[in-house]
């Protein structure tokens, strides 16, 4: 059997039941689409990273137990209709933070990071993010 990854993008297979199977290009981003940034001054400081995917290293300031902080990410790769997904990366205590992108606009997004542990944390947690293009064109 052929490796499905060998099927070229846009290749269609018709079946006897009139169903079509289409091969799509690989999902993901190459190195050129990846960016990194380190937050300066505090956990609420705005960061600038112009990339479709990447890692944000937060400032190591203290974040009290069950407390949230918001910060803006300026990013020219984001359109107003895009979806930004985020999760805690490998930096910081595993499972200690709840991470969400709570707002998206043209060239900007807002992240909320919550310390979900029973104690204060002072570490440079990392956030991995990806921008999903949802434009109709």
Language-model region placement:
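Terminal beta-strand-rich extracellular "head" domains
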Residues: 82-92
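Extracellular receptor-binding modules and their adjoining Ser/Thr/Gly/Asp/Asn-rich linkers
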Residues: 2-78, 104-137
